[in-house]
Swiss-Prot record:
Organism domain of life: Eukaryota
Primary location: membrane
GO CC list: membrane
Keywords: Membrane, Transmembrane, Transmembrane helix
Keyword Ribonucleoprotein included in the entry's annotation: no
Cellular localization per UniProt: Membrane
Phylogenetic placement of the source organism: Eukaryota, Metazoa, Ecdysozoa, Nematoda, Chromadorea
Name of the protein described by the UniProt record: Serpentine receptor class gamma-2
Keyword Transcription carried by entry: no
Amino acid sequence: MDSSTAPLSIITKLALFERTCDSSYSPLAENLKYLVQFVYLLPAAMLHARILYILLWKHRNLYLKQSFYILFIMSCIACFTLVVQDIFFARVFQYMTQFCEPMSEFVENYPIFPAIYYPLQQHLHCAQPIIQILLTVNRMSCVVIPWKHSQVWKSFMKYAIALVILTPFLFIWNIIISKKLPVYTFGGFYIGYERVVIWATMTLFMLILRAITIVITAVCTFITVLRLTRMSKRLVSSERTLCIASFLISSCFLGTAAAESLFAFQVVRTSTSISYFLLPISWDILNVGTPIVMVMASSQLRRHVFGILKRSRSNSRVEDGTIVTGF
C-alpha cells in the first residue's frame, strides 16, 4: 500500500494537524520546558544507575537472594532506559523546536532509528505493568505463604523474567510491522506509526493491560494488608518496608494509568490538549518516583546507594536470607 494512502492510527490522525514543524512556538520558551524537565530527569537517571550498580554488582550477594529485588531490578532497567530516551531523544524532539526540521528529516530519512527506538519505548511501557503485577503478587505471597515464599519464587523467577521480556510483544507487534513517522505537536514532534492492522491500536492494548494490572494490584494489596494485620509484630516489621515500597510504587503506577485512560477516551484532541501534557508527566512520576520510593523506604538500600558507612545492627540485618530493613 502506498504510504500516502496508508491508514494512520487514530492518535496519529488526531495529532497530525500539520505535516511540518510549527514555527509559531517560541524556541526559548520550549527550550526552558526541556531544561525544567532535564533538571529532574538527569538526577533520576543517575539514581537509577547507582541503584543498579548496588544491586547487580557491589552488593549482589545480598540483594540477588531476594525475589523482590530481582523484580525491582527489572523495573529499574525499564525506568532507566525510558528516562535516558527522554533526556536524549523524546524531549529533545519535542522542545528543541529550532532543530525540529533537521531532526524530523533524520527520522524520516533513517528509518532504522525509529524502527528501534519506538518499539523499544513501547515494549518498556508494556513491561512496566507486568512488573507491577509481579511485585504486588510477590508481596502478597510473602505474607500469605511465608514458609515457602522464597522457594516458590526461586523456582518461578526464570518464568517471571521471560514473562516481562516476551509478553510485551503481544501488544507491540503492530508497531513493529508498521511504518514509523514524525507526528508534529507543540512546535516539535514525537514518533508515531501508521497501523498496518487497523483494529490493533496500542492505546486499546495498553488500556486493557493497565485495567488488568489495576484489578490485580487492588486485590493483592487488599489481601496483603489484611494478612499483615494478623501477623506477629516481628514478622510485620520485617516485611513492612518492602510492602510499603510496593504500595507507593503502585500509587505512581495508578497515576500513569489514569493519564493514559484520559488520553484513550478523549474523543476530540487539539494541539493544546491537556492530555498531551499529562501523559508524559505521569510517566515521569512513575519513572522518577520508583527509585526515590525504594531509597526512602529501605534504610539499608539508602545507606548502600549514598555510601553511608555507619550501620545500625538493630535496624539492618540478614535473617535466613531475608533482608530486614527499617526506616
